[in-house]
Every structure is written in structure tokens, then in C-alpha cells.
Amino acid sequence: MLTLPQRVLVIGIARSGTAAAAALGARGVDVVRADRKLGNDDDLALLDGVGLVVKSPGVPGENPLVVEARAGGIPVWSEVELGYRLLAAPAIVGVTGTNGKTTTCELLGAIFRAGGRDVVVAGNVGSPLTAARSAEWIVCELSSFQLEDIHELRCRVAVLLNLEPDHLDRHGTFDAYRDAKLRIFERTDVAVVPRGLGLDGIEFAADDPLPAEPRIPGAHNRENAAAATAAARAAGIDDVAIAEGLRTFPGVEHRLELARELRGVRYVNDSKATNTAAARRGVAAFDAPLRLVLGGSLKGEDFGAFARELEPRVRRAYLIGEAADDLARALDATGVPYERSGDLGTAVRAAAAAAEPGEIVLLSPACASYDQFENFERRGEEFRRLVQNLS
């Protein structure tokens, strides 16, 4: 039985923080809420009488409230750590990695349901873990931010999909980012890992034989399917159910999602491609000539190698957001023509006006969205709206 302190500080007022505060309040805890931007000397008084700090994923460890709490011996938990303890140690399949987490989690949910299991998909996708209902199994998407402050969270099956540079603006170095990701294995029963990384566990790769071919397109999605297959088998799901899930799962929003086909031109929403590794996979998923919408907020990535890989496939790039200058410099060293569109609406209209039948207008921005949109979902929704309004 989890004993909670009388007073808890929740830092972050977005989705995870709101769910954590609601879960604590429902258990009679006096909840103090703080925006993640707080942290001057006056704000530190929020810690008075607090016995636990719960921080949302967007709150860095350098936040003054977090630093002061740790210095004072106050425990600091991530929202998923709180959710795990409130659910009394549920059976979790945890999924982390740089790219493919949401697709793999939702695919696992489909596979578990095909196998007749009671399953909830939660964490960084679906509902926050503190808002999830009790279930036989929980498939939990875990970001590096969420894994930074776990203490007892234990996965029956822990999956690492891939490891490529990302969130360096938050973690500082790739080593720090990798170390956060690998925390998923600290207390796991079964580890599922990519072949070739040199990690202990059940290995998977894109060329693994599968019970059925996945419905969703792209070589990267076959790799996601291989990871899901290995994880499902480790959880006791038979190949009949796995095959059913692979054949029927339609994919998820904002990941190589066909938004519209108009006069022979396909418009594809891959707004979730918030780093170059994800955008590289998006570009590689198609053989047709591409008109590629790139840009958004910067995350500390070097675009040079990514830009060089675009030349054979991309007919023209349309640059948006604060990353436009960096992307332009990278593209100047290649033969890829580009134009500075500034915003998504201008980019979509320009690409649509120039696109020829058989081409694809692809939003796969290789950047986060926060300079112009609340999140990648809002960016993808705006892309869909713009595309539907084309005539």
C-alpha cells in the first residue's frame, strides 16, 4: 500500500502534471501546482511542507525547484513513477527509443487485444500513467525525460527501439541521452533490443521473419513490427494474435499519414518526425519524387548529413520556422533546391502549386514544433486542414 505525504508539489501544468495532480487530489493529498517556468527565490517557498515533488516530462533537472528539492532531501519522481506506484506495480511493457515509440506501442495494443488481453496504452501516448485504469497489461511509452526520475518502476518487458541523437538541447550530450534511455532496463524481467547495439536481451531487426507482414508502410515500420513481435512473444502472446495485429493495425496519426490525394498528388502528414533520424525514415518510405516541408524549432542537431541524403529523392524543400537558416546552410552544400516559406501555410500552398501528378508533398519536418505550434499534433492537424482546403 503506497503511503503518500500530506503535501506534494507537482511541477508542470500540462497533460501529465494535470493528471498527476488529479490522481493525488483524489487520494486526499494537498497538491501544490507550479508552472515549469517558476524557480526564482520567491517561488522556492512552494516547497514549504512538501514531502514529494512530481515533475512533468518537460521539466528539466536543472529547474531551481527540482534542484532545491533534491538538496533538501525531498524525493523527486517523474509522473510515470507516481503512476506505477498508484497502480500497485502493474504488468508493464515499456517502450522507449528515439523514434517509433508511439507506433510500436499502439501496434502492441492491437496485438494484445487480438490475443484477448485486457490492455491499456498509456504514458507518453494515450493517457498519462497516473490517469490510466487498472488493466491486465499496460503498454507504456517512455521518453528519456520520463525515465530520468524513475526509482521503482519495473517493466515485465522493456523495449529499446533505436538510439540516435535527439533532445541534445535538454540532455547536453548523446551519452547523457543514451544513459537516460537505458534506465528502462534497470529492473526489467525481459529486455528487447536492436540487433547490433551490443546490449543483452532478445534481439530484433527489420529483416526478421514475422508471423505476417505489417499493414503500415516503410522499412522502419517493419523494424517496429519486429520489435513488437519480440515483445509480444515475451509477454506470452501467440503468433496467431500477433499476425492479426500486424495485418490489421492501420498506423497512427501524424506518422506517414495520407492526408489527401488531389489530382495525382499525395499529401502525407509525418509531423511526428521531430528529428533528422525520423525524417530520414519518412523520406526513405517513398519511391516517388518528394516536395518536402522541413523546419520548426531547433533541438541542437546538425543537419549536414541529413541534407546530403535528400538529393536523390527530394525535388524541392520548403523551409519553415526558426530552423530555416540552419537548414538552408546545410542544403546549400547539396544540389537540393529550396525556398524559405516561413510558415506552414505558405509552404503547403507553394508545394501544391508546383507539384506534378505522381509526386508527394511530405511534411516530415526533422524539427520540433514549439516555435509555431503547441506540439507536433497541432502542426499535423494544421497540415491536414491546409491540404483539405486546397482546390
Map each language-model feature to its residues.
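Glycine-rich Rossmann-fold phosphate-binding loop(s) that bind the pyrophosphate
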Residues: 13-14
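Nucleotide phosphate-binding/pyrophosphate-handling subdomain across enzymes
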Residues: 2-8, 18-23, 27, 89, ...
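Conserved beta-strand positions in the Rossmann-like core of class I SAM-dependent methyltransferases
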Residues: 9, 32, 120, 318, ...
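C-terminal helical cap/extension that packs against the catalytic core
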Residues: 304-359
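Adenosine-cofactor binding site in Rossmann-like domains, unifying the SAM/SAH pocket
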Residues: 35-41, 209-213
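Short internal beta-strands
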Residues: 32-34, 192-195, 293-294, 313-323
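Phosphate-binding loop of NTP-binding sites
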Residues: 22-27, 38-50, 57-192, 199, ...
